[in-house]
Amino acid sequence: MVVVAVAGGTGGVGRTVLDAIAKSGQHQAIVLSRTTSVPTAVDEPKRFAVDYNSVEQMKKILQENNVQVVVSALLLVDEAVAQSQINLIRAAAQSGTVTKFIPSEYYIDFHAPIPYVSLQSILSRQRFSLFSTSGADLFTNFQLEAEAELSRHAQLTWTLIRVGIFLDHLTMPHNPKTTYITPFWVFVDIDHEQCVFPGDGSQPLVLTHSQDLAAYIERLVGLPAENWPRESVVASNKLLVKDLESLVNKVTGKKFKVAYDSVECIHKGRITQLPSNTAVFQDPAKGEMFRDVEHQVMLSMLSRAHDLPGKNLAELFPEVETTDIEDFFRSGWTLKQSRAP
């Protein structure tokens, strides 16, 4: 039995990973969080309040619990969180017990150049990054910083996991599978029967449910370090963006209102807003962040960032059943209809 520490275990990805570990019954998990709380169920993992500014304190927690694998599910939205992950990597490397580390990626290839982004536009915006605009030095990239830090610690085996966009977003708020992913609408607004796609829709797209990612992480935890790929891919569904329009029509039997935003409009941040995102963008705490997320997602689609390099984990773990996009969308649509007044 492997002891796994999940950092950010109270967030969307972290909770999903903990569910997968609990379901398998093969490993023991603990949660690293900024705050601690008493488990409400007997089988809930222990939670440890950590000071992400203290490498020494985190190292001690990892040692005392004989942690062998660390899974980071921290949401890298600013410099402070990015530094928290760097410190966690250092604590793991110094612990003497941790041998494997999964950093927070779970999206695209962060080395891929993202076109149509000028230095001026970057400098005029808040320093918030989900991906690199150049793979270089237009501004520091949090994921690349973590990768560089991991490369300094030969005692750690690590893998970068790329999954594309979470399929969970496609049917929100009608979720046919359990999801803890924060409500946010990407490409399709099922309630308002609207879609918005980038450019001509000919870009490659990967959509993976959060439960699929978690299932593969659970398998990786038990895999010997020598068999870990440096780059991993979970690609439950590979298609072109415009294929979503035909999928929606096929499943619903309706013609959704569809907008194809031009490259120029996306570049300038003039993106057709899906109605369900109105409340999201008005959130005083996270609204601006989600506007940035929307812009960056659309920009990333204009590149080849969804041509994900790495070892397909389906080849390593063929027993994992992944979520088919058509079945998922049909179930979500059926759920929506069942809730209609």
Curated annotation (Swiss-Prot):
UniProt entry tagged with the keyword Zinc: no
Known function: Oxidoreductase; part of the gene cluster that mediates the biosynthesis of swainsonine (SW), a cytotoxic fungal alkaloid and a potential cancer therapy drug. Swainsonine production occurs via a multibranched pathway and is dispensable for fungal colonization of plants and infection of insect hosts. The first step of swainsonine biosynthesis is the production of the precursor pipecolic acid (PA) via conversion of L-lysine (Lys) to 1-piperideine-6-carboxylate (P6C) by the aminotransferase swnA, the latter being further reduced to PA by the reductase swnR.
Disruption phenotype: Leads to higher level of PA accumulation.
Species classification: Eukaryota, Fungi, Dikarya, Ascomycota, Pezizomycotina
Broad class of enzyme this protein falls into: oxidoreductase
Pfam families documented for this protein: NAD_binding_10
Pathway(s) served: Mycotoxin biosynthesis
Record's keyword terms, sorted: NADP, Oxidoreductase
Cytoplasm among keywords: no
Family named by the database record: Belongs to the NmrA-type oxidoreductase family. Isoflavone reductase subfamily.
GO MF term set: oxidoreductase activity
Name of the protein in question: Oxidoreductase swnN
Gene3D superfamilies the record matches: NAD(P)-binding Rossmann-like Domain (3.40.50.720), UDP-galactose 4-epimerase, domain 1 (3.90.25.10)
Known EC number: 1.3.1.-
